[in-house]
Amino acid sequence: MTPEHLPTEQYDAQLAEKVARLQSMMAPFSGLVPEVFRSPASHYRMRAEFRLWHDGDDLYHIMFDQQTKSRIRVDSFPAASQLINTLMKAMIAGVRDNHALRHKLFQIDYLTTLSNQAVVSLLYHKKLDEEWREAATALRDALRAQGLNVHLIGRATKTKIELDQDYIDERLPVAGKEMIYRQVENSFTQPNAAMNIQMLEWALEVTKDSKGDLLELYCGNGNFSLALARNFNRVLATEIAKPSVAAAQYNIAANHIDNVQIIRMAAEEFTQAMNGVREFNRLQGIDLKRYQCETIFVDPPRSGLDSETEKMVQAYPRILYISCNPETLCKNLETLSQTHTVSRLALFDQFPYTHHMECGVLLTAK
């Protein structure tokens, strides 16, 4: 695979290899055949980052070969959304001959939605001044005149210039209901929107007969907790990043959800609070004992759950675990399988044509 060519004819074979690999990895914990969720074969990534290469008068996006580290020119990127591909050409055309925009530009980041909104961030090794702002405003207006719903941001050391806003609002159809998700530039969002819809619908399906409340750790912008709110009496969710917490609060209001509470704290801190080890001012007014959480949802970073959180989640009758790294999932399962059984297993092809796998497991207490 190269950045400008996807081996779409090999999609089925690469997916089958992942299914076999996941089943083998999970064999010590479950004999289940994974439920498999396919990605679109192209134009599935909603965000992308490129370095910029200045070659005389020419200017173009580049990526680096992961093995050789050699530079690869990228004029089109079929893994990314159609909107990103359109913007890549439009941005180069708008920046190439404009000194204020081109000088010391080293990277462009693209974030798009299925609702055809975009935030484009231009990263510089220079101080951004009023001349840059005027040139960027003119470029933004020219892009909008082409029918592109785009917002531009300039970034440099200790500097961030928003021409109007640093977010876009995604709209996803999830199990018969449209969900609105504010996505903030430079914050984590699910990269494959079509796969995100399938993950949300799978999570809804496996928790459809739930009792009591839901606790979620690492909730981000509320991606899962807001969609799952319809299956539970109440949802209590934690997140550490301020922009993500602010986006989650907006998303709660935008979706008219009244049974979700977001707390800004790390999973490790929440574990301490639940165990009565420490008290936190951020929990004032929230009585944790009022929540009857029979299900806990975790979507941890690639490192998986730390040992203290492992112990904490074992106290819940049901654990819903979304993993972007099955190796650390299996490491966690060495502990979790002592008290819980894997009752559902799913593979989500979040990153086609790569080694990476995303998977979900539902664990029920023995």
UniProtKB/Swiss-Prot annotation:
Record: active site: 324, 358
E.C. numbers: 2.1.1.-, 2.1.1.35
PROSITE patterns: SAM_MT_RNA_M5U, TRMA_1, TRMA_2
Biological processes per GO annotation: tRNA methylation
Catalysis performed (reactions): uridine(54) in tRNA + S-adenosyl-L-methionine = 5-methyluridine(54) in tRNA + S-adenosyl-L-homocysteine + H(+); uridine(341) in tmRNA + S-adenosyl-L-methionine = 5-methyluridine(341) in tmRNA + S-adenosyl-L-homocysteine + H(+)
Keywords (A to Z) from UniProt: Methyltransferase, S-adenosyl-L-methionine, Transferase, tRNA processing
Pfam families in UniProt: tRNA_U5-meth_tr
GO terms of molecular function: rRNA binding; tRNA (uracil(54)-C5)-methyltransferase activity, S-adenosyl methionine-dependent; tRNA binding
Protein residues bound to S-adenosyl-L-methionine: 190, 218, 223, 239, 299
GO cellular component: cytosol
Similarity remark: Belongs to the class I-like SAM-binding methyltransferase superfamily. RNA M5U methyltransferase family. TrmA subfamily.
Summary of the function given for this chain in its UniProt record: Dual-specificity methyltransferase that catalyzes the formation of 5-methyluridine at position 54 (m5U54) in all tRNAs, and that of position 341 (m5U341) in tmRNA (transfer-mRNA).
HAMAP family reported for this sequence: RNA_methyltr_TrmA (MF_01011)
Protein name, UniProt field: tRNA/tmRNA (uracil-C(5))-methyltransferase
